[in-house]
Amino acid sequence: KNIWSAGDCASLLFGGKRIRLESVQNAIDQAECVADNIVGNKREYSPHPWFWSDQYDTKLQIAGLNTGYNKIATRIGENSSVSYWYYRADKLLAVDAMNDPRCYMIGKRLIEMGKSPECELIEDINFDLKSLLET
């Protein structure tokens, strides 16, 4: 009891499995949760993982974890941008966005809100994804 760990290599339960989220943001979020618990503000750590990487002329931004997916929706954007939306059944698990910060931010917020839009809406380039955040 009263043993805590935090950092980018500390493991945690996520989706019923023990994993490590090796990212700076996760290390910061875990440390904040541990600090809250140390001072008596009891709370569980329930992360909404996100990552980014610059690979030459491509900015990759990831929200969520795509493990266990069985369906992918692809959204083709402008100027060679693209995003991949990963689902298990009808539940949105993750979004990988290449050079598409708008899709990344919308996907991240949808995951945080627990919303899972239909694949057909994601793939429809004429559909305004931002409208999904309003309901």
Model-identified regions with their sequence ranges:
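Conserved catalytic motifs of the protein kinase core domain
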Residues: N2
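A short, polar/charged loop-to-alpha-helix boundary motif
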Residues: P101-E120
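Cysteine/selenocysteine-centered motifs that mediate thiol-based redox chemistry or coordinate metal-sulfur cofactors
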Residues: S116-T135
